[in-house]
């Protein structure tokens, strides 16, 4: 039996889909577990949150094998530099704040960007964003799993960074 996933506009076999999710992280992680988005969403819903992951996709539980930099976007009022969700810089480079909001299904349009360095040995979730706040999502998000990890550094306004 061959695993196949349809995500966005393309259909891929299971391994291609999972490799695409990892992107530039592929050689920097150890994969601990594959979980259904539904099972991870159930955990978030039990805590009173909306489902963060797209249904019928896979969430990867991974451990970083080397120090790795990510970015976090925020508006400075409703969200701040430090927080539990980050993304790869290459996933938002060149996007406007409105495009980032749509791709990552953010409640508020981000204004600022910060760099987040996670350490080798940090364990995180990585998966495809589901619909929220009137947006379809579809981007790949990294969940710090409610751990207080990472070194957060302000980079400035998204418009100046992109």
Annotated model-derived regions:
Residues 2, 9-162:
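Catalytic toxin/effector domains delivered as secreted proteins or via bacterial secretion systems
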